[in-house]
Swiss-Prot record:
UniProt-listed PROSITE patterns: CNNM
Keywords assigned by UniProt, alphabetized: Cell membrane, Glycoprotein, Ion transport, Membrane, Signal, Transmembrane, Transmembrane helix, Transport
One MF term in the entry's GO annotations: transmembrane transporter activity
Residues carrying sugar: N88, N302, N403, N528, N592, N667
Classification via Pfam families: CNNM (PF01595)
Protein name (record): Metal transporter cnnm-2
Signal peptide residues on this chain, from the entry's feature table: 1-21
Domain CBS: from-to ranges: 344-406, 442-512
High-level lineage: Eukaryota, Metazoa, Ecdysozoa, Nematoda, Chromadorea
Cited function: Probable metal transporter. Probably acts redundantly with the other metal transport proteins cnnm-1, cnnm-3, cnnm-4 and cnnm-5 to regulate Mg(2+) homeostasis.
Main location group: membrane
Region described as Disordered: 708-734
Extracellular side: 22-153, 230, 283-760
Location of the protein in the cell: Cell membrane
Length: 760
């Protein structure tokens, strides 16, 4: 026992060295450890021999335990002996330096051999710690994954595909309602019908399908995140998984499926069915719960949405539907929302007649200028007391000189008068008009019609007017009474079947009789400029009476002096040519009219085929280019170019044509009574051919009448002498060389008497 104590004292004395009279204890290391958690970065664990395993090039907190450590000036690391130390850690880097503990930070370099600790003090120099439990092995960290990297990459590609499919189906399939699929199955192309038929059965289970694709999408995205976390750590795994899911799992598939969702959904329908089968225990109860509380997926397209869809198609250039067809469809859809008030013509714009007016030329002119065929008739001067209707057809047998009043004609025909409420729907009124009894109705204020018709129009909704057509007519018909004061109403407008048709077609209808059109859509009044004015209505050109003998003789003399074309014309044909082509212009100006009516005989730039000779009255010549106006009186002719062309053609022994014309550079108008001779190219050519034929049959001719008994023909000469009353013509007349074809005349005519019908 005494020996053991002595040996320990010797050992202790061996560790105590005196330097300059100072005792120093030799540093002793009892252990080394990493002062951080086991899972901390850099510490990997312990080796088979008990050495510390740290990650190479990773800074760790190294703790050295023992006693006598306060005199340590430096800590070095070596792989063999202290003389060949590779790294040194000075005392200045110790952030804990005590007698029993030294702590500092250090990053070890990867090395095949473990690093050994060497301590250096002032008295003892380098002291190597050979305990293998104090060794530190720096190794390169190797991350172990769940499975090989190539397998994880393949699984990631598969998961990204499934994620993209689920995201696309969520938008593509759920955007197509069962109603839209049903429409495609009936009216789509062959490919659309096939795809819609494949999707329709599972799309009917909308909530269950929605739960399936959403749950699968969440599961797959979670798997993608886990695999990325296994392949990489920290920020890299987060960024990679986020970018991959957003770009490849959401944006790209949804941008494709929003346009081709039908085709994608149909071609991947077997995958969708597999997912629905796989998740059936989860999605079936969820779908039932959603069906009960969220409702079944039923899309009902109301009228307003359908109208807006049609309007959007009108603005789309790729729409293959005709624009007019879309307008009609929109008009039909919006017709039920409109009432009579929205379509009617305002009462101030309605053309009416007083029953006291006389049907003279002035009134007839107003009626014709209006362009209307049904005209309301009011009592006295009160336009609010409309008592009857006047149809233009009622005036067919009434002359403008009979001075019959409007009241007499209206009461005789007793046309049906209809007064409707301004809030009456157009559909109800159109049902009445379709009966055919009337196509025009007066519109009264709503409160007054309701008052007299027992509240049949209590509200303006369509439902209140869904009645039988005849019942509706009886409920709203204004009774024909002698005293209309018993049912006073305030008229606000007029409506016709044409107004309703225009709303249906979404276009204004203008026929050939429209002069003033009230455009209800644009609220403008348009004027039909192609219609004649009232002053021109009774300006007419017609055939006149025959000329007197004196006037006829003067006309013949003037024509014979004007051109030799008439010189050798048959007298009877010449006389008929004149008498049968006398025309006159009659002008009946409206009463109180400041501008007289005019009639154009020639228009500048418009070809004409007639020759005119004014016999009575005056005409006005206007040269538009030079802005010159002249008045001409009797014995002024126009269209001489036609006679000159005819004369030149005959003198050249050519067959004249009825196609001769001349192009005036002036306007010839008549503003008062005028009588003139009109010779057209056809009538002139006819008279010349008659004259030629008469001349031919009056020349001696030999004709074979019969054979005698000896077989030789008997010749008979017949000479037609000229009439003693025939006029002597100039021998220089062009008719001496007249050679007109007479093929159109009857071949059997042999005498002048038989020519009388043609000459007439």
């Amino acid at each position: 026992m005494i020996i053991k104590v002595f040996l320990r004292l010797l050992l202790l004395c061996a560790h105590i060295v005196c330097i300059d009279g100072k005792l120093e204890i030799r540093p002793v290391v009892s252990g080394v450890r990493i002062e951080s958690d086991v899972d901390a970065s850099g510490f990997l664990g312990y080796g088979d021999a008990g050495e510390l395993l740290v990650e190479a090039n990773t800074e760790v907190d190294l703790v050295i335990f023992g006693h006598g450590l306060e005199n340590v000036e430096m800590v070095t690391f070596t792989d063999s002996v202290c003389v060949t130390s590779e790294f040194n850690v000075s005392e200045s880097t110790f952030y804990i330096h005590k007698d029993m503990k030294i702590v500092f930070k250090y990053a070890f370099v990867a090395w095949p051999q473990p690093w050994r600790i060497c301590l250096k003090s002032e008295c003892h120099g380098l002291i190597q710690i050979d305990d293998d439990r104090t060794w530190i092995q720096a190794v390169q960290s190797t991350h172990e994954t769940f499975m090989p990297v190539w397998a994880q990459c393949a699984i990631l590609c598969l998961l990204f595909s499934i994620s993209a499919l689920c995201s696309g189906l969520t938008l593509g399939l759920m955007a197509l309602t069962p109603q839209e699929l049903s429409i495609l199955m009936k009216s789509g192309s062959q490919r659309e019908k096939k795809h819609a038929a494949a999707i329709y059965p599972i799309r009917c289970h909308g909530n269950r399908l929605l739960c399936t694709v959403i749950i699968m999408n969440v599961i797959v995205n979670t798997g993608i995140t886990l695999l990325f976390d296994d392949l990489a750590e920290g920020l890299i795994a987060f960024v990679a998984s986020t970018v991959g899911i957003v770009v490849f799992g959401e944006i790209l598939p949804q941008s494709i499926c929003v346009k081709y969702g039908l085709a994608v959904g149909a071609n991947t329908i077997f995958i969708t069915k597999f997912f629905m089968f796989l998740l059936f225990p989860i999605t079936w109860p969820l779908g039932k719960i959603l069906d009960k509380y969220a409702g079944v997926d039923i899309d009902v397209v109301n009228r307003s949405r359908m109208v807006e869809m049609l309007k959007m198609n009108m603005e789309n250039d790729a729409c293959d539907i005709d624009l007019s067809t879309l307008k009609i469809a929109i008009g039909a859809m919006e017709l039920t929302k409109k009432s009579v008030r929205d379509v009617m013509t305002d009462i101030d714009d309605v053309f009416m007649l007083s029953e006291d007016q006389v049907l003279n030329a002035e009134t007839m002119t107003k009626i014709s200028d209006s362009g209307y065929t049904r005209i309301p008739v009011f009592e006295g001067n009160n336009r609010n007391k409309v008592k009857n209707l006047l149809y233009v057809s009622d005036l067919a047998l009434i002359g403008k000189d009979n001075n019959i009043t409007v009241k007499a004609v209206a009461r005789f025909n007793k046309r049906r008068l209809r007064i409707v409420d301004e809030s009456m729907p157009l559909t109800a009124l159109m049902d009445e008009f379709k009966l055919g009894d009337y196509h025009l109705a007066m519109v009264a204020k709503a409160t007054e019609v309701k008052k007299h018709h027992h509240g049949k129009f209590a509200d303006g909704t369509v439902d209140s007017f869904i009645l039988k057509s005849m019942k509706l007519v009886e409920a709203t018909m204004m009774p024909q009474v002698e005293n209309p004061e018993d049912h006073p109403v305030t008229l606000v407008g007029l409506i016709t079947l044409e107004d309703i048709t225009e709303e249906l077609l979404q276009a204004e209808i203008t026929d050939e009789t429209d002069c003033y059109v009230t455009d209800d859509a644009q609220k403008k009044r348009r004027t039909n400029t192609s219609k004649k004015s009232a002053a021109e209505l009774f300006c007419s050109e017609k055939k006149s009476e025959r000329l007197s003998l004196h006037m006829l003789e003067m006309t013949e003399k003037w024509l014979l002096e004007k051109t030799p074309l008439f010189g050798n014309m048959n007298p009877k044909a010449f006389e008929n040519l004149i008498q049968r082509n006398i025309r006159e212009v009659l002008i009946v100006p409206p009463k109180n009219s400041t501008s007289p009516g005019t009639l154009n005989l020639f228009e500048a730039g418009v070809m004409s085929k007639r020759f005119l000779l004014i016999l009575e009255g005056k005409a006005t010549i206007r040269f538009n280019e030079k802005d010159l106006i002249f008045e001409c009186g009797p014995w002024t002719c126009f269209g001489e170019a036609i006679l000159e062309k005819m004369e030149m053609c005959i003198s050249d022994r050519k067959e004249p044509s009825t196609g001769f014309f001349f192009l005036p550079d002036y306007n010839l108008t008549v503003s008062g009574p005028c009588r003139f001779l009109q010779i057209s190219t056809s009538s002139l050519l006819h008279s010349l051919r008659i004259t030629q034929f008469v001349k031919e049959i009056r020349t001696p001719k030999i004709s074979i009448t019969s054979d005698d008994d000896f077989g030789s023909p008997t010749r008979k000469a017949s000479i037609l002498d000229s009439s003693p009353n025939s006029r002597k013509r100039s021998s220089t007349s062009v008719m001496n060389s007249l050679a007109l074809p007479t093929a159109r005349l009857a071949a059997k005519i042999a005498s002048v008497e038989e020519l009388k019908p043609l000459m007439e």
